[in-house]
Structures are given as C-alpha cells and as structure tokens.
C-alpha cells in the first residue's frame, strides 16, 4: 500500500483516474484476484472489477520492485480487465533480485536502483 502515496499525486498531475490494487481481501465490492509467489509462500492482489474498462491506458506505480511478483500479478489483472499497460514506475528497484526482467515489459522506470 505504500505505492499509493506516489500513485495518487501522479494521477492528479496527469489528470487521470487512480485505481487501487491491494492485497487480497482489502477492497470492497466485486474484485478480480491474481495470486503470485513470494520467497516464503504465496499472496494475492485484487482490483475492483469495474475500475478498468476495455482499452484504458494504465501506468502501474509502486514504491518498490524486488522480485517483480506483485507488479506482474497487477499487470495480469489490468490485462484481464481489458486495460493496456503503458508503463511500470517504481521509486526503488532492487536490481539484484531481477524483478524488472521478470515483468517482461519494454517500459519500466525506477528512480533509485540499489
């Protein structure tokens, strides 16, 4: 949920909608869910079913990319709902964990590579 503090002002600046992606069980109403692997198990992420429409252009923003599991699962949900991922943006990228390669996107931006 730390990505919210970056994503909300970016959405405001771009004059576009802000859609929440949260760990499973934290969003109200009907959601779609994707599961992903962690080093120590599995987890899930959800987006509300009506938050993204066919053809919406989506920038996925988070505070950190490590292994890329959360970002890849979020991207899968966006595409399942009909959205088009324009780019991924992160404050911090832990380059030794290879998350950017795991996502398999041509457009990944991070401010700090550590």
PLM segments and residue spans:
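Short, glycine/charge-rich flexible loops or terminal/linker lids adjacent to PRPP-binding catalytic cores
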Residues: 16-58
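Short Gly/Thr/Asp-enriched flexible loops that form oxyanion-binding sites at enzyme active sites
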Residues: 5-14, 75
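A short helix-loop-beta submotif of the ANL/AMP-binding
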Residues: 14-17, 83
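Conserved G/P- and acidic residue-centered "switch" motifs that form tight phosphate/ATP-binding loops
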Residues: 63, 68
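PRPP-dependent phosphoribosyltransferase catalytic core
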Residues: 72-114
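Short, well-ordered secondary-structure micro-motifs
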Residues: 8-9, 30-32, 98-101
């Amino acid at each position: 949920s730390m990505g919210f503090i970056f994503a909300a002002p970016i959405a405001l600046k771009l004059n576009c909608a802000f859609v929440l992606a949260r760990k499973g069980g934290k969003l109200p109403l009907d959601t779609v869910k994707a599961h992903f692997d962690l080093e120590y198990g599995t987890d899930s992420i959800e987006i509300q079913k009506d938050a993204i429409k066919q053809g919406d252009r989506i920038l996925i923003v988070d505070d950190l990319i490590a292994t890329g599991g959360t970002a890849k699962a979020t991207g899968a949900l966006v595409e399942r709902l009909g959205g088009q991922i324009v780019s991924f943006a992160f404050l911090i990228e832990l380059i030794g964990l290879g998350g950017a390669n795991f996502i398999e996107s041509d457009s990944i931006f991070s401010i700090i590579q550590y």
